[in-house]
């Protein structure tokens, strides 16, 4: 999916839900809108804090129910290793396999379609008689910006942000 505006993304989600005959409630739409404004993954509780700006009465079950719906529809992915959620940038391709690249330094999460891996996963699943419904592959490492920061040997003379604390220690 090309870079789309938030309004285009929400309109696309509404259209998909109408085609599937499922209800995209105003609350679900608002959670999706908030997700679309994030640069990367966000925890349910951070999402709740954002939702409370518009809906002060919102409680954790409100967010979790909305996230469950958005997960079922393929609009978001759960990043299991960080217990966070990220907008799916490929939700116009409902059967895709996602590869999530998670930066252990800054926490950025980038999604890529893993077409070649998808075939391998289906072959392995078929050997076991396993019926795959959805694949998400998570890989941890450093994003390009953090690789550059970690390679920097002169922090006092560079333009890098050395203040970011490592989110997860490498194994």
UniProtKB/Swiss-Prot annotation:
GO terms for molecular function: DNA-binding transcription factor activity; DNA-binding transcription repressor activity; identical protein binding; transcription cis-regulatory region binding; zinc ion binding. It comes from the Bacteria. GO terms for biological process: DNA-templated transcription; negative regulation of DNA-templated transcription; regulation of secondary metabolite biosynthetic process. Keywords: DNA-binding, Repressor, Transcription, Transcription regulation, Zinc. The keyword Protease does not apply. GO terms for cellular component: cytosol; protein-DNA complex. InterPro entries: FUR (IPR002481), Fur_C (IPR043135), WH-like_DNA-bd_sf (IPR036388), WH_DNA-bd_sf (IPR036390). NCBIfam families: PRK11639.1 (NF008646). Belongs to the Fur family. This is Zinc uptake regulation protein. It comes from Escherichia coli (strain K12). The gene is zur.
């Amino acid at each position: 999916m090309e870079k789309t505006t938030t309004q285009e993304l929400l309109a696309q989600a509404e259209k998909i839900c109408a085609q599937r005959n499922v209800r995209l409630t105003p609350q679900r739409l608002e959670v999706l809108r908030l997700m679309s404004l994030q640069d990367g993954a966000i925890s349910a509780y951070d999402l709740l804090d954002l939702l409370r700006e518009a809906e002060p009465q919102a409680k954790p079950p409100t967010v979790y129910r909305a996230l469950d719906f958005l997960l079922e529809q393929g609009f978001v992915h759960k990043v299991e290793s960080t217990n966070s959620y990220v907008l799916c940038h490929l939700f116009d391709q409902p059967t895709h396999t996602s590869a999530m690249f998670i930066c252990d330094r800054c926490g950025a999460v980038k999604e890529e379609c893993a077409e070649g891996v998808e075939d391998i996963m289906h072959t392995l699943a078929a050997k076991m008689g396993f019926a795959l419904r959805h694949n998400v592959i998570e890989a941890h490492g450093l994003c390009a910006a953090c690789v550059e920061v970690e390679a920097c040997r002169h922090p006092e003379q560079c333009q890098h942000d050395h203040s970011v604390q490592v989110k997860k220690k490498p194994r």
